[in-house]
């Protein structure tokens, strides 16, 4: 928008200068109605040509005589003067936008300085750049605009203060860090004092605090021992076998090859008296077989004789009892004898 206004101002100035030059040129030319020009200021009185005085010595119908050399020279000088005036006016009009821009820059800088909040310093780099632009712009235009002496001093003082700001801000940051460290240290001391000594600082005695501390230590020791004991018991329970291997053995000589010895009992692993578990023949009339039974369990059982898949003979004795326990066992019995 500023460029548009500048162009309008320049165009208007040039148009006005052109009109003024045309008006002056018309007024300086000889009259069209036969009016004679006034004599020039530097011309002698005798050399002014009167109207109708031609070289022939008489007027010829009111016609103006031919212009003399002196009149031509004076007209040329007049044209040069008016041309120079036009050029100077155009130069002045061309400098108007630049001067207006410089004035706007100065006004913006003053407004920026007035609107800076209290306790905050504007950016030193931007201030230095604007100051350099101000110093360069007036110099490039022949010193037409400069800061007053008081404002230059204020700018220099502000620049020096801004140059010293980083160190001062660093000192402030260090002071804040030190204060925060001290505050954190004090908080840690307060917490440790209250957690270690209990209510000593709240009206209690030192002996009471010692007793409470010892009691807490005893409680923690007991809980630790209890935890270890439970842990040991858990390990023992996990190491205890869920089943044990019981090997049943008996000496018996069968009469035929279709006969064999078996074992039965009240546990499901022994057939619950309805079925049987066959024993394998080894040698010399020894029959043997291993059965897995639950650990630490009491079962009732007996040897039986099986022929053609049927029980044909039971031991001639009461039921046998077995305590399985937690280890593998070998149960060796004699037929019919406990």
Swiss-Prot record:
Residues passing through the membrane, by range: 7-23
Pfam families in the record: CBM_20
Membrane topology, Cytoplasmic segments: 24-338
Major localization listed first in the record, in broad terms: membrane
Residue span(s) of domain CBM20: 238-337
SUPFAM superfamilies: Starch-binding domain-like
GO CC list: endoplasmic reticulum membrane; membrane; perinuclear region of cytoplasm; phagophore assembly site membrane; T-tubule
Localization of this protein: Preautophagosomal structure membrane; Endoplasmic reticulum membrane; Cell membrane, Sarcolemma, T-tubule
GO molecular function: cargo receptor activity; enzyme binding; glycogen binding; starch binding
InterPro entries, sorted: Carb-bd-like_fold, CBM20, CBM20_genethonin_1, Ig-like_fold
The record's account of how the chain is modified after translation: Ubiquitinated, which leads to proteasomal degradation.
Task performed by this protein: Acts as a cargo receptor for glycogen. Delivers its cargo to an autophagic pathway called glycophagy, resulting in the transport of glycogen to lysosomes.
Name listed for the protein in its UniProt record: Starch-binding domain-containing protein 1
Species this chain originates from: Mus musculus (Mouse)
């Amino acid at each position: 928008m500023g460029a548009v206004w500048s162009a309008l101002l320049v165009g208007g100035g040039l148009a006005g200068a052109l009109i003024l030059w045309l008006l002056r040129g018309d007024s300086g030319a000889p009259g069209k109605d036969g009016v004679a020009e006034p004599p020039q200021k530097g011309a002698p009185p005798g050399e002014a040509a009167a109207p109708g005085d031609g070289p022939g010595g008489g007027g010829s119908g009111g016609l103006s005589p031919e212009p003399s050399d002196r009149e031509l020279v004076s007209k040329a000088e007049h044209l040069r003067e008016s041309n120079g005036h036009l050029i100077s006016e155009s130069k002045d009009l061309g400098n108007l936008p630049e001067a207006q821009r410089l004035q706007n820059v100065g006004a913006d800088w003053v407004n920026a300085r007035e609107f800076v909040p209290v306790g905050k310093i504007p950016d030193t780099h931007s201030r230095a750049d604007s100051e350099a632009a101000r110093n360069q712009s007036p110099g490039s235009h022949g010193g037409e605009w400069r800061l007053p002496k008081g404002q230059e001093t204020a700018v220099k003082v502000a620049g020096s203060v801004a140059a010293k700001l980083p160190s001062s801000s660093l000192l402030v940051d260090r002071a804040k860090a030190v204060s925060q460290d001290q505050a954190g240290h004090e908080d840690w001391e307060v917490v440790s004092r209250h957690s270690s000594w209990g209510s000593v600082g709240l009206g209690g005695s030192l002996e009471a605090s010692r007793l409470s501390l010892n009691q807490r230590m005893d409680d923690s020791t007991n809980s630790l021992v209890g935890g270890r004991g439970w842990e040991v018991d858990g390990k023992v329970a996990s190491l205890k076998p869920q089943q044990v291997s019981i090997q049943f053995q008996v000496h018996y000589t069968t009469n035929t090859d279709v006969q064999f010895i078996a074992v039965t009992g009240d546990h499901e692993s022994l057939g619950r008296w309805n079925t049987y578990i066959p024993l394998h023949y080894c040698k010399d009339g020894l029959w043997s077989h291993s059965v897995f039974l639950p650990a630490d369990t009491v079962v009732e059982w007996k040897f039986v004789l099986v022929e053609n898949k049927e029980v044909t003979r039971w031991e001639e004795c009461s039921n046998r009892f077995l305590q399985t326990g937690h280890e593998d066992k070998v149960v060796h019995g004699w037929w019919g004898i406990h």
